[in-house]
């Protein structure tokens, strides 16, 4: 990704600023320079905010990015154009903020555009989908982008020197290695769960095995001694439990069947005898009851006759009851007519009185209407009474505050005038500072060179002295070598090959005899005596060996001396006589001191000007704030005056409390009047409605009374006709028979009961005679005792069989469970063995004692170090390489970094590096980490990079090393920006993005040197 253009609106110190990165040519290094606090880092905050809605550091929130001097109703907006893989994109992101006068926050906005067909086309317009689009486009999240795009070297120095645990936190964030820890934890949890499950199965198996019933069988009891964990042996003996149980059950079943037949036979005999005895007893009892019932038969016949007479007189009785009810109804209707007539008279009198009350009340109608108009006109003022109270109360206070603010504004304007006069249009002369700094830099370089010449002169003289000494040593060694060669050549070298052959010759002599053929030469042996002096040969051999060693030593010394002379000559060739003689630097040091004094004087003047400008800026801001407050107070005064005038003109009152009292009194009078009038009118209406109802009721009752009299006459006629039909001559006869009507129901019930009992006895006696005919009765007690005895024996046998069946069923379930558990155990143990081993390895139980996550982090760290060493080797002349310290310990080990020194051919602690060397190692590590993160995040190509480092803390030598290192970054093919305010960097970097602060805002511009 390569930045093209960045537009900032109300962002940090930039109110309306555009940075065009097209001013930076391809692969060009440029410097971002400016005073402390001018907003250099805010440029990268803006880029990260545009892409991810966050700042370039975690410590800053989105609300901290908005300019404090932005207009309250204008948003903070960042527009960022960039190039990615030969395509152009533009992002517009607006931050959330609260407009002046609003309580709710105005939400942020996001728009993502892609350049197509000579114009930008909208791709996303919603924040969530837009963020996902950008993340997918870049292939990295905000944290990874910070590591790739901005390299804060101080952070990487801490990363370089940190312990394994600290590196682990950083690397796991960048490479999302928590997933490996989760995999390890998930696997460990699964293994733990499986092991717990297996142990639970063994416990269940042991419980089932212990609970298995042995039926007191000796063989089964011996089987139960087997341990529950010997699953193979248990499987072998389980069939014995089933077989033994079935044999015992067959015996119990046979015994029970025999006893069952005996019990059934005894029970049948007992039941038949009991039935016969009961039938005979019931036959005798029912015959006695039947004879007693027949004694009352004549009395029942008399009651039948009386019921017949009562049934004939029933119609006349009904007619008499109807007549009596009708006469009673007639009396009630006459009484109701009298009551209704009295109620009508009372209602007419009440209506007259209510009309008089209404007329008296309406005489006050005009006064009430006047009050009603007052209420309507002043209703709004009553509802907002607090507003007008506040207007009266605040008017004088606001007027006093307004006068005070005007006085303060006059005073502040005088201060602005005085400060402007002191400033006298002066501006800080930073250009002069840069020129002096450049001159000091050049003078220091010259002094450094002269001092180096002085050191070189000393080293040159030492080398010349050392050269002469080595030449003398070489001459002496050459003479010694000639002397040793002469001694070596003078020694007799004949028969030296027989040295160490004395034992062999003696062995051959012992095996041969005079006159035999020699096995070596084939001639006849004449004598076996020794004719070789082995001691003399050994002495000469030792002398030659000693001389050879001395010659080799002298030769090695000559080669070493010649090599050292060659090295000295090579070192001497680096020096020039002219530079060695130029070592006078005292005058230049005096000149540097003068330049420092001149720079100090200009710095003091610049600081004074900056202080006056800052003071003027504060005065102007205070003046602006006072003007805004005066306008606000003036607006409040006008609002209060308008409110007071409206109140007094409309209500006629100058005190709000008096108006409120008047308004509430008028309102209560109107409400009381309306309520009383409504009550009277409603009462009149109710009286009239009731009166109409009562008159209708009287008319209805009179008609009903006439109908009742007609009904009484018709009933009398029907009674006379019915008496003539029956033969009664007087009402007394009818009443006498009617008096007996209450007995009718009881008489009929007695008659019906007699008939049913008689018929029931006759049927039951006939049935019992049929059952007992020709049957013999035995002793029931003896039969019962025999049955109970057989029943008890049978129940005992049944209980024994049931108990055995239960035990068999219990054993069957247990055996099924045991087989199931053993099958599951065998399956789990076979399938989980490799998983158990894998879990232990991933948890750190391995040769390296590393967890899975730390193993992965070591892999990433080694890749980072490999990438970093490619640059570090170039930076340090192939001297240093970063290496991972190999060690074995439980936990997060193996992430410490050592440095390998090629000069000493061994590794040493990273803290042993000098400041400049540490800077080079940190920078190489930062670049290596950046490139590996790119590879892991999908191979995104970031064509630009920014290095943010406090170069002002470095000494001169380390700064030179840093500059050389940073200048070499152009070869990586990236646009590289360096953030710093160190003046020396301006002399080495030709393109500068200058960030200038003016009062409360900053501006930027590119300049070339």
From Swiss-Prot:
GO terms for molecular function: ATP binding; ATP hydrolysis activity; endonuclease activity; exonuclease activity. Residues 178-214, 243-309, 337-503, 578-842 form a coiled coil. Keywords: ATP-binding, Coiled coil, DNA recombination, DNA replication, Endonuclease, Exonuclease, Hydrolase, Nuclease, Nucleotide-binding. GO terms for biological process: DNA recombination; DNA replication; double-strand break repair. ATP binds at residues 34-41. Belongs to the SMC family. SbcC subfamily. Heterodimer of SbcC and SbcD. SbcCD cleaves DNA hairpin structures. These structures can inhibit DNA replication and are intermediates in certain DNA recombination reactions. The complex acts as a 3'->5' double strand exonuclease that can open hairpins. It also has a 5' single-strand endonuclease activity. This is Nuclease SbcCD subunit C.
């Amino acid at each position: 990704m390569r930045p093209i253009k960045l537009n900032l609106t109300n962002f940090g110190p930039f109110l309306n600023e555009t940075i065009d990165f097209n001013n930076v040519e391809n692969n060009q290094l440029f410097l971002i320079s400016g005073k402390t606090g001018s907003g250099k880092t805010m440029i990268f905050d803006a880029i990260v905010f545009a892409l991810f809605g966050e700042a370039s550091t975690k410590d800053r929130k989105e609300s901290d990015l908005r300019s404090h001097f932005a207009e309250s109703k204008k948003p903070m907006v960042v527009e960022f154009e960039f190039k990615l893989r030969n395509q152009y994109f533009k992002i517009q992101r607006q931050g959330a903020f609260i407009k002046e006068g609003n309580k709710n926050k105005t939400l942020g906005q996001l728009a993502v555009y892609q350049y197509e067909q000579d114009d930008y086309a909208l791709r996303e317009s919603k924040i969530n989908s837009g963020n996902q689009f950008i993340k997918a486009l870049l292939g990295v999240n905000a944290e990874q982008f910070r590591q790739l795009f901005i390299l804060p070297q101080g952070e990487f120095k801490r990363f370089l020197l940190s312990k394994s645990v600290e590196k682990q936190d950083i690397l796991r964030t960048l490479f999302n290695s928590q997933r490996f820890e989760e995999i390890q934890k998930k696997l460990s949890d699964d293994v733990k769960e499986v092991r717990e499950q297996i142990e639970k199965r063994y416990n269940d198996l042991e419980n089932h095995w212990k609970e298995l019933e042995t039926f007191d069988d000796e063989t089964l009891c011996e089987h139960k001694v087997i341990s529950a964990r010997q699953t193979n042996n248990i499987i072998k003996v389980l069939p014995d439990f089933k077989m033994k149980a079935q044999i015992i059950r067959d015996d119990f079943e046979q015994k029970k069947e025999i006893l069952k037949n005996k019990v059934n036979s005894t029970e049948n005999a007992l039941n038949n005898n009991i039935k016969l005895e009961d039938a005979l007893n019931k036959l005798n009892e029912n015959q006695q009851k039947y004879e007693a019932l027949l004694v009352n038969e004549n009395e029942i016949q008399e009651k039948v006759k009386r019921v017949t007479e009562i049934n004939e007189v029933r119609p006349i009785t009904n007619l008499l009851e109807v007549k009596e009810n009708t006469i009673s109804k007639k009396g009630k209707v006459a009484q109701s007519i009298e009551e209704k007539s009295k109620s009508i008279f009372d209602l007419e009198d009440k209506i007259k009185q209510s009309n008089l009350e209404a007329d008296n009340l309406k005489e006050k109608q005009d006064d009430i209407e006047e009050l009603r108009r007052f209420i309507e006109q002043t209703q709004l003022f009553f509802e907002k009474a607090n507003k007008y109270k506040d207007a009266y109360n605040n008017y004088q206070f606001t007027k006093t505050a307004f006068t005070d603010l005007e006085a303060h504004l006059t005073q502040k304007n005088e201060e602005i005038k005085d400060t402007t006069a002191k400033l006298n249009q002066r501006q800080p002369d930073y250009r002069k500072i840069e020129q002096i700094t450049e001159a000091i830099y050049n003078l220091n370089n010259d002094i450094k060179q002269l001092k180096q010449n002085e050191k070189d002169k000393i080293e040159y003289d030492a080398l010349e002295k050392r050269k002469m000494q080595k030449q003398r040593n070489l001459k002496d060694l050459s003479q010694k070598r000639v002397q040793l060669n002469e001694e070596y050549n003078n020694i007799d070298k004949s028969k030296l090959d027989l040295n160490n052959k004395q034992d062999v010759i003696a062995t051959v002599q012992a095996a041969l005899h005079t006159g035999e053929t020699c096995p070596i030469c084939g001639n006849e042996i004449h004598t076996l005596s020794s004719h070789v002096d082995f001691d003399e040969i050994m002495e000469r051999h030792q002398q030659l060996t000693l001389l050879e060693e001395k010659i080799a030593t002298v030769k090695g010394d000559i080669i070493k001396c010649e090599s050292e002379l060659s090295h000295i000559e090579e070192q001497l060739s680096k020096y020039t006589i002219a530079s060695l003689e130029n070592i006078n630097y005292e005058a230049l040091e005096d000149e540097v001191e003068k330049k420092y004094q001149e720079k100090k004087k200009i710095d003091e003047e610049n600081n004074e000007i900056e202080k006056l400008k800052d003071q003027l800026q504060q005065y102007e801001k205070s003046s602006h704030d006072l003007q805004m407050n005066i306008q606000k107070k003036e607006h409040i005064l006008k609002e209060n005056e308008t409110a007071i005038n409206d109140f007094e003109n409309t209500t006629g009152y100058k005190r709000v409390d008096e108006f409120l009292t008047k308004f509430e009194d008028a309102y209560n009078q109107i409400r009381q009047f309306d309520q009383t009038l409504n009550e009277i009118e409603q009462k009149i209406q109710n009286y009239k409605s009731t009166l109409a109802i009562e008159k209708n009721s009287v008319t209805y009752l009179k008609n009903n009374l006439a109908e009742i009299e007609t009904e009484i006459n018709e009933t009398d006629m029907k009674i006379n006709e019915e008496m003539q039909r029956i033969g009664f001559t007087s009402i007394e006869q009818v009443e006498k028979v009617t008096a007996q009507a209450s007995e009718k129901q009881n008489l009929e019930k007695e008659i019906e009961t007699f008939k049913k009992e008689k018929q029931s006895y006759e049927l039951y006696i006939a049935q019992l005679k049929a059952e007992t005919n020709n049957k013999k009765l035995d002793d029931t007690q003896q039969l019962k005792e025999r049955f109970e005895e057989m029943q008890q024996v049978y129940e005992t046998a049944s209980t024994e069989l049931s108990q055995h069946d239960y035990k068999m069923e219990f054993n069957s379930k247990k055996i099924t469970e045991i087989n199931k558990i053993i099958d599951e155990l065998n399956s789990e143990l076979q399938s989980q063995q490799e998983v158990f081993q894998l879990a232990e390895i991933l948890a750190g139980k391995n040769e390296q004692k590393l967890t899975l996550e730390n193993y992965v982090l070591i892999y990433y760290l080694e890749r980072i170090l490999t990438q970093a060493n490619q640059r570090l080797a170039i930076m340090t002349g192939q001297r240093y390489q970063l290496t991972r310290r190999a060690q074995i310990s439980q936990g997060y080990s193996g992430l410490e970094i050592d440095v390998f020194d090629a000069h000493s051919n061994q590794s040493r602690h990273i803290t042993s590096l000098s400041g400049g060397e540490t800077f080079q190692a940190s920078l190489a590590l930062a670049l290596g980490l950046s490139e590996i993160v790119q590879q892991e995040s999908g191979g995104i190509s970031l064509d630009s990079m920014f290095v943010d480092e406090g170069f002002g803390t470095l000494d001169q030598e380390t700064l030179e090393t840093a500059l050389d290192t940073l200048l070499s970054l152009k070869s990586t093919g990236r646009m590289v920006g360096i953030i710093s305010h160190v003046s020396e960097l301006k002399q080495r970097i030709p393109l500068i993005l200058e960030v200038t602060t003016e009062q409360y805002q900053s501006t930027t511009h590119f300049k070339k040197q």
